[in-house]
Amino acid sequence: MKLAVVTGQIVCTVRHHGLAHDKLLMVEMIDPQGNPDGQCAVAIDNIGAGTGEWVLLVSGSSARQAHKSETSPVDLCVIGIVDEVVSGGQVIFHK
């Protein structure tokens, strides 16, 4: 699993049928201190995350399982919206 911050939404009206009508989000990965690390990606989201929110992601076959379709071309899927992150006894993020 990975942590990321949602930086935007992608509108794609023509897409593979395996993606249905799920929302596509632009996300930036977060390092252990909670800072964006510059790695951007597109994740499928069917739980309703919004811009600026921290999210928990899964990739590969786990993303396809989370999307409930082993045959869809999904490589990154939002599985949670983060409320709080504590690392080393310190709160590094609180919604």
Swiss-Prot record:
SUPFAM superfamilies listed in its UniProt record: EutN/CcmL-like (SSF159133)
One Gene Ontology term from the biological process aspect of the record: DNA damage response
Top-level taxonomic group: Bacteria
Pfam families per UniProt: EutN_CcmL
Residue ranges of every copy of the BMV domain listed in the record: 1-83
Gene Ontology molecular functions: identical protein binding
CC annotations in GO: bacterial microcompartment
Pathway: Amine and polyamine degradation; ethanolamine degradation
Keywords: Bacterial microcompartment
Record family assignment: Belongs to the CcmL/EutN family.
Protein name: Bacterial microcompartment shell vertex protein EutN
Gene that produces this protein: eutN
